[in-house]
Design a protein with these regions (language model features):
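A short, structured active-site edge motif that brings together acidic residues
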Residues: 1-12, 102-106
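Active-site mouth loops of central-metabolism enzymes
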Residues: 11-26, 47-48, 52-53
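Short, acidic/polar
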Residues: 19-36, 84-89
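Outer-envelope exported proteins of Gram-negative bacteria
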Residues: 2-4, 43-45, 76-77
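Short, basic/glycine-rich phosphate-binding loops at helix/coil junctions
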Residues: 6-12, 40, 153-156
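Short, small-residue-rich loop/turn micro-motifs
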Residues: 5-7, 40, 48, 133, ...
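Beta/alpha (TIM)-barrel catalytic core signal, keyed to glycine-rich beta->alpha loops juxtaposed to Asp/Glu
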Residues: 51-235, 240
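Active-site groove signature of glycoside hydrolases
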Residues: 33-54
Length: 243
């Protein structure tokens, strides 16, 4: 069991109850531990970069939490490569606990930012990626092959629909079906297995609305993809500039 949480987003109307300042980090961890009913977190993520707070201040606060035994490891989420590099180098300079993980969005349909910007900063430093949205908001499951179901995420969230739902992407996802069928797995399992096989990826974060979806996702960890299968997927999903 790995218990993690995040800090950054506003938790109240209080101007200090947000961001990555030392004050907010120190106050937030105690509230988080109380809510979760635990003495410590395995991983504490800085959920977004905070332009209002120096990276040095944030890094030192995280170092202090580890020294106090409230956190075992700390990491970042959706930070730019230069920010990850700066945090790592600051910690090295002062002998503080280093950031150990970054949490970026990454999937077959969202590749360029991670592969061209983030991995060059994280992989040489041993910073592992804990990927979110590996199914591209459900797009890679095949759910949207024939339109948008009313109760689906794309039916509720226009921004997600605009990001991923294009005729080209629908056709790409359809091309995954024969590959998945040949392997005896679902397209969701194929998409998750692909992410897990990528260099620098330590784990993935998945969402599920039903227990059977969760069980289906977990089975992806047992899937082994050959170099030939990876080549087929790369032919379908050539990296494009992320925006």
């Amino acid at each position: 069991l790995v218990i993690s949480s995040k800090v950054y987003w506003p938790m109240s109307e209080d101007i200090n109850d947000r961001g990555l300042s030392r004050k907010h980090i120190m106050e937030s961890i105690d509230k988080t531990l109380e809510r979760l009913g635990t003495d410590y977190l395995d991983i504490y993520f800085c959920h977004r970069p905070d332009p209002e707070t120096p990276i040095r201040e944030t890094a030192f606060a995280m170092h202090n939490l580890i020294e106090q035994g409230k956190v075992l490891y700390w990491g970042t989420s959706e930070w730019e490569s230069w920010q990850i590099t700066a945090a790592y180098e600051i910690c090295e300079r002062y002998g503080w606990h280093l950031p150990k993980t970054e949490q970026p969005q990454y999937s077959m349909l969202w590749r360029d930012r991670v592969e061209k910007q983030i991995l060059p900063a994280t992989e040489p430093r041993g910073v592992g990626l804990v990927v979110w949205s590996p199914l591209a908001m459900g797009m890679l499951t095949g759910k949207y092959d024939n339109g948008v179901p009313e109760d689906s995420r794309f039916g509720r969230e226009e921004w997600a629909k605009k990001r991923f739902l294009t005729d080209e992407n629908v056709e790409r996802v359809r091309q995954l079906k024969p590959i998945a069928d040949d392997l005896g797995i679902t397209r969701a399992q194929l998409a998750l297995a692909w992410v897990l096989r990528q260099s620098g990826v330590s784990s993935v974060i998945t969402g599920a609305t039903r227990p059977e979806q969760l069980l289906d996702n977990v089975k992806a960890a047992e899937v082994e993809l050959s170099d030939d299968v990876i080549a087929q997927i790369d032919t379908i999903f050539e990296p494009e500039d992320a925006s």
